[in-house]
Amino acid sequence: MNTSVSFPATSRRSVARHPVWTVSVLVAAAVLAGCADMSGITPQARLRDPASVGLVATAPSAVAAPTVSTEWWHAMGDAQLDALVAQALQNNPSLKVAQARLARAQAVTEVADAALLPQINGAVDLTRQRYTETGAVPAPLAGSIRSTGTLQLNASWELDFFGKYRAALDAALGTVNAAEADAQAARVLLASNVARSYIKLARTEAQLVVARRTLAQREETLGLVRDRVSAGLDSQLEQHQSEGGLPEARQQIEALQEQSQLTRNALGALVGDPKVALVLSAPALAAIKNMDLPPAIPADLLGRRADIAAARWRVEAAGKDVVNAKTQFYPNINLVAFAGLSSIGLNRLIGSDSLQWGVGPALRLPIFEGGRLRANLRGKTADLDAAVESYNASVLDAVHDVADQVASARSITRQQTEQQAAQKSAESAYGIAVQRYKAGLGNYLNVLTAETNVLVQRRQAVDLAARALDVQVGLARAVGGGYTAAALPVQQVAGE
């Protein structure tokens, strides 16, 4: 139930003679506002302090400044990759969804902003009617048929004494800022997904080179074995063993070609053009350059990650929603006015005698709402707690993400050093085994063993090179992909 206290329209001179009306409205509003019961409804969640996750205390100050360009993929030195990312940023549907959400949030902000301003509308009413002879209508109107007309402007302005509409506007602005950060996060994620898929394709193509080289070596070895069998130096066992390696190598090539096509299809979907799979040149893994990235977790990580910025702005918006829910307990104070022309008989509508106008305040206060206002406040407070915990989870996930990428980057560097030494030994052993077999000093089992070892190392070299690049892309994304928040809300929970 809503109780409203309305004041009759009167003239400007009458209002001037009774300034006590305005004072009475404000006093009544203050007294009635004191009856608002919001006890026991407070936010429970708290924002995690950056120092509690080690961002300030352990990170070196040397990496506090942004080190990743907003177009970080250019540092990889691949023109085809640059073109793919540019096409994806222009055509990808997921990115357009994020941009549409931003446009919607901006429209909501305009609606909230309009609520702070006076509202004016016009009305035109033209009616032809017969007046009853058995009602309260006096003669000569009773029983007659007349035309009535009204031309009127109505104005109203709700005075935002308790900040209801300001809180709604601030909440909408927070949502806009969150949507802007979401759009940037989508951009960073899309670019990293394109780069990672491109590296995956380069890895597959490099593995194809290894597989084809292996097939050629096995064909060469099979020719040698057949010559030795013809000369009576080896048996059919060695020949069958050598022949068995060819189908296995061809099967591996076919599997890698399938993987290559699937990756090309994925790239086509990411860039929004399936035809890309048909015209894309095979990327060379060795031609993709390494990037210069932070060696540790940046101290200002919270300002670099668009997803964290979006989560923080959602906390701010939820806090303002709580403020708005609290203002629902307070009175609404409106100033209303109208002016226009009204007459019975259209021939007299336009004239000074038909002029009517009025102005006055109106006070409305919720007295009994069946618990609706408290339930609404509890819901908005729960939304705030959820937004805070979502932000805290985003912070922890971000720190975990960067820490994993940094640890992997360091480990892969050490692994590559060891793998290169292992491959050098395996290549030498394979060459010696083949030479000894040709000279009749070794058996075919030694050749098979050496070939297996060198094949493992060649594949491992490709995998580590691809993984090193993939981790670099992951690290570029994890530290924000070049995003820097212009400003974040103060580190507190709004709405308290």
Where do the PLM segments sit?
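Small/polar, glycine/serine/threonine/aspartate-rich low-complexity segments that form flexible
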Residues: 67-76, 126-154, 277-294, 323, ...
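Short flexible linkers and secondary-structure junctions
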Residues: 36-193, 333-337, 367-377
